[in-house]
């Protein structure tokens, strides 16, 4: 058996911020849009985390409803969906279109989704039933409205797929169920298919070859791999097997668990973010954990019953780390929000399980 690998990652770029962003939108040119809970401004960054512009776009959180920002694949349009409206601006933040709707309830809301050719955009608004709308962008006309099964019970997240005529709609309902839909569309038709095999799964991403989709568990379930385009289950990694590794985190009262995030970093390897703030590595083919990423400046510390850091093994009740969120960006790098208030980028080497 190959030895468990610890892979150190030096910081490539970092940007100190006054507060961690409520949302990070990854742009097609490798840059980013940041918005914040308590500030109305949006900051545009380039791929090196240098500021391009900063503008008041009223993108703050209101009544516990985040503003969700989406950019079109050609970077010409920006969509902002908040508590009471969906807005579209140009790439400089100038308003082009606005759709007002009833307020979302606390912690609900919807993102937006642009088609690959920037011909259409989709969003959900709260009506008697939450309704999925398709907007034709050439004249800003809503051409489809599809009532969904719930009303003010879900948040709505969109994900692109390798097929430009299909996308995914995820509907997490707080601490309750998570449902995933596959949406197919043409210029004049749209269908929704519930993917029941993905119930209570958190959407991850597609492998770079476009053949496999990964999901993280909502609670104690397994990490799942699904084929594409069939979306059939091809593999599962139960958490008890993922964490069956000989390491130093055995003293906590509750064991480590997956923290809602599993992401492909290449065609052979996926990353699993854990409750203890760890970045575990697993092999796509054997579904075994073989290593851990150690990003520079991101520590995992032991805590005692009072929530204070401790080095006394007999006092340890839990562990926690510095990583708040992580994503894989357009360049295949690791993008992290850090507990210090910094945004950090780490280059990822080519990583795969070693064979012996």
Regions found by a protein language model. Give the residues of each.
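A short helix->beta-strand "capping" segment at the edge of beta-propeller domains
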Residues: 1-20, 47-57, 308
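Blade-level signature of beta-propeller repeat domains, shared across WD40, Kelch, NHL, RCC1
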Residues: 320-356
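Beta-propeller fold detector
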Residues: 53-57, 96-102, 144-149, 192-197, ...
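Hydrophobic beta-strand positions that form the internal "hydrophobic ladder"
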Residues: 32-33, 78, 120-121, 167-168, ...
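Solenoidal tandem-repeat scaffolds enriched in leucines and small polar residues
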Residues: 119-208, 215-219
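Conserved loop/turn motif of beta-propeller repeat scaffolds
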Residues: 29-30, 74-75, 117-118, 164, ...
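Structural motif
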Residues: 39-43, 84-89, 128-134, 174-182, ...
């Amino acid at each position: 058996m190959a030895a468990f690998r610890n892979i150190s990652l030096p910081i490539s770029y970092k940007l100190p911020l006054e507060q961690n962003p409520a949302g990070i939108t990854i742009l097609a040119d490798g840059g980013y849009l940041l918005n914040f809970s308590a500030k109305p401004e949006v900051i545009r960054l380039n791929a090196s985390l240098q500021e391009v512009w900063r503008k008041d776009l009223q993108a703050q959180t209101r009544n516990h409803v985040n503003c969700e920002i989406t950019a079109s694949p050609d970077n010409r349009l920006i969509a902002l969906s908040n508590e009471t409206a969906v807005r579209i601006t140009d790439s400089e933040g100038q308003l082009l279109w606005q759709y007002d709707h009833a307020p979302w309830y606390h912690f609900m809301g919807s993102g937006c989704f642009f088609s690959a050719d920037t011909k259409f955009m989709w969003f959900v608004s709260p009506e008697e039933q939450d309704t999925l709308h398709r907007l034709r962008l050439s004249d800003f006309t809503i051409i489809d409205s599809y009532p969904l099964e719930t009303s003010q019970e879900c948040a709505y997240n969109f994900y692109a797929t390798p097929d430009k005529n299909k996308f995914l709609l995820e509907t997490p309902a707080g601490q309750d169920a998570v449902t995933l839909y596959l949406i197919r569309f043409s210029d004049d038709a749209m269908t929704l298919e519930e993917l029941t095999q993905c119930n209570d799964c958190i959407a991850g991403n597609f492998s770079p070859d476009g053949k496999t989709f990964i999901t993280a568990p909502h609670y104690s379930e397994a990490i799942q791999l699904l084929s594409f385009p069939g979306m059939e289950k091809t593999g599962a990694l139960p958490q008890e097997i993922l964490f069956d590794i000989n390491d130093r985190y055995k003293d906590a009262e509750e064991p480590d668990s997956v923290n809602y995030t599993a992401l492909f970093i290449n065609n052979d390897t996926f990353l699993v973010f854990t409750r203890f703030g760890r970045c575990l590595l697993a092999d796509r083919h054997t579904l075994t954990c073989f290593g851990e990423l150690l990003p520079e400046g991101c520590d995992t510390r032991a805590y005692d019953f009072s929530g204070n850091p401790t080095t006394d093994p007999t006092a340890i009740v839990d562990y926690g780390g510095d990583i708040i969120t992580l994503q894989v960006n357009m360049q295949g790098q690791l993008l992290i929000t850090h507990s210090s208030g910094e945004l950090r980028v780490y280059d990822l080497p080519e990583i795969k399980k070693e064979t012996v």
